[in-house]
Amino acid sequence: YAAKDGSSLYLTIDSTLQNNCERELANCVDQNNDENRACSINKNAKTGDILAMATSPGYDLNDRNSIYSKKDQLTLEKYKEDNPDDEEGYNEKYAELREKQWKNKAITELYEPGSVFKVVTGSSALEEKVIDLNSTFTCNHSIQVADRTINCWTAGAHGTQDFTTAMTNSCNPAFIQIGQRLGIEKFCSYFRAYGFTEPTGIDLPGEASGLYVAEESMGIVELASCSFGQSNTVTPIQMITAYAAVINGGYLLQPHVVSKIVDNNGNVIQTVEKTVRRQVISEETSAEMRQVLESVVNNKGGTNPYIKDSLLNTSDAPDE
């Protein structure tokens, strides 16, 4: 067969944002001595477009067989030093570390989301009307759940606080109380609705899905820890997809990196449109959550700067 030109793939990636994302993420990893790699996703909450996605340490596509992580380099050196005659074992360890660095952490690796998950618990409780913006929650540093004492992340106590203040403080006992008001059945229902029990369907290979406490196995202790982002594990792409639904009117959108496909004559043969999987919360609840989250970042105690428009990047402090 005669060779013929293929089609061109146009991406949603913004090259400037991607460059900035890679640079700042690498700086963050260096400054915090992160030994488990890190990732960052920048997403348009209104459309599902992925504007930037990076993993650090990454690798050079022109030399993908080298090991770039300093930690992994030391691991290989130590293995060779301890096992000088075990060439087969060294090669197996090298292959394992090389394949790990090839993985896109944003879609393949699981983590406990921590405090960023509190928007899911909070929005679900608002939607069910078991709380409102004026509801109050008391933090005395710790809270007793059955035979467990669960502490807040701070060494002190937040005292009595309304919902917005509890979100600003990222208060664990407050969100345990919110989870208790929501209850196991409703909590698990919204956990499913926000997409945490299934892959997002992003148009990239190798997407994983989270590991979570099943509803039939969940007790009041598990509900407590899950309510502030512990016990369940998710992928970063699952978390940012759910977070986007919280603020975009309540719509769970399928994320994507492909914008369109154009043939060699310049004809658009496929355009990737916004795909709404479901509406999780109402427009009204979503508006309340936007109000709360804008207050969080604008008031003292908030953790990230306000960014105009619905571009979304998620993060969480390691001690939360």
What is the predicted function of each stretch?
Residues Y1-A38, K46:
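Conserved, well-ordered alpha-helix/loop/beta-strand core segments that scaffold catalytic motifs
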Residues C39-I41, V258:
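Conserved beta-strand and immediately adjacent loop positions that scaffold enzyme active sites
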